[in-house]
């Protein structure tokens, strides 16, 4: 049994502290069970385009720290949904875990059915359009958040085989040398990027500027680093061996002027890659 506590002080009254504490305990338990915890967002999508019989589907996991553009990219998928997506199921909005099954595939799970999203990063007016099912936290502050139900417990616990394992890069500009979607060529290259956990902090925490955290996840992995390193090595080796696309997605959320367009273009770039399986045209 694992036990944790939050001091009964006003400065610890922020909902996120309680949420992250619970998730930290969850991550530790997952590592003890042989699963790799992740700080990221995962979605199962099915595309339109005459694919109902053949099935163009993809399970996408975006890993990254706070303000990396994970939830915002999922929000962009939602906005693009009417045109390109037949079905979209959010499996994990913030935390989850990965296990290697008997066939060597990566199976990913979520942890919670709700999303804890910054108001400033949502499409204008969206949160208030969901007011009947939303809980809005500290709307007068910079780090104002809204809690929205986004997944079912069945999807959270089902376990989906991964097709794309991506790091959400919010700090690099896009150019010919740095494409929106960059695929890695080896486990070592991928581990270097994921382990560094770089993110351009937006002032939504106590950090600002380019900061680093071990695997973009301070909630368990640093405290059990030896176990985590072993699990991460096995997971990334299995990813390349089983054909999972591993890389980084440049969301540009941390670059001024790209708060909305960055995640949207990242979502479009990812959709274009998935749509190459069929003749579906997606504008840049």
Language-model region placement:
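Generic recognition of stable, solvent-exposed alpha-helical segments in well-folded globular domains
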Residues: 13, 17-21, 68-72, 90, ...
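Conserved nucleotide-sensing/catalytic segment adjacent to the nucleotide-binding pocket
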Residues: 85-155
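Glycine-rich phosphate-binding P-loop
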Residues: 48-83
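Conserved NTP phosphate-binding and transfer environment spanning the P-loop NTPase/kinase superfamily
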Residues: 140-284
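Secondary-structure transition/capping motifs at alpha-helix termini
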Residues: 32-33, 80-88
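Charged, amphipathic alpha-helical linker segments immediately N-terminal to NTP-binding catalytic cores
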Residues: 1-39, 245-253
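Short, glycine-/Ser/Thr-/acidic-enriched flexible segments
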Residues: 9, 48-50, 67-68, 113-115, ...
């Amino acid at each position: 049994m694992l036990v944790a506590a939050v001091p009964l002080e006003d400065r610890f009254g922020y909902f996120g502290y309680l949420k992250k504490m619970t998730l930290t305990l969850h991550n530790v338990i997952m590592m003890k069970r042989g699963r790799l915890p992740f700080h990221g967002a995962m979605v199962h999508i099915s595309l339109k385009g005459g694919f109902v019989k053949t099935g163009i589907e993809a399970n996408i996991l975006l890993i990254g720290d706070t303000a990396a553009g994970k939830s915002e990219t999922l929000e962009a998928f939602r906005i693009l949904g009417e045109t390109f997506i037949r079905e979209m199921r959010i499996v994990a909005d913030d935390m989850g875990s990965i296990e290697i099954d008997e066939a060597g595939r990566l199976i990913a799970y979520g942890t919670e059915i709700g999303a804890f999203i910054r108001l400033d990063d949502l499409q204008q007016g969206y949160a208030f359009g969901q007011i009947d099912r939303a809980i809005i936290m500290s709307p007068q502050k910079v780090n104002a958040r809204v809690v929205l139900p986004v997944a079912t417990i069945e999807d959270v616990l089902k376990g989906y085989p991964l097709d794309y394992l991506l790091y959400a890069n919010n700090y690099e500009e896009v150019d010919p040398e740095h494409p929106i979607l960059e695929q890695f060529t080896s486990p070592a290259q991928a581990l270097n990027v994921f382990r560094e956990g770089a993110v351009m902090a937006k002032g939504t925490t106590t950090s600002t500027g380019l900061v680093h955290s071990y695997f973009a996840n301070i909630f368990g992995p640093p405290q059990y680093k030896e176990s985590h390193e072993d699990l991460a090595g096995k997971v990334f080796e299995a990813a390349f061996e089983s054909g999972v696309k591993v890389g980084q997605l440049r969301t540009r959320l941390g670059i001024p002027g790209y708060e909305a367009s960055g995640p949207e273009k990242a979502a479009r770039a990812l959709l274009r890659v998935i749509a190459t399986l069929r003749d579906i045209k997606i504008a840049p």
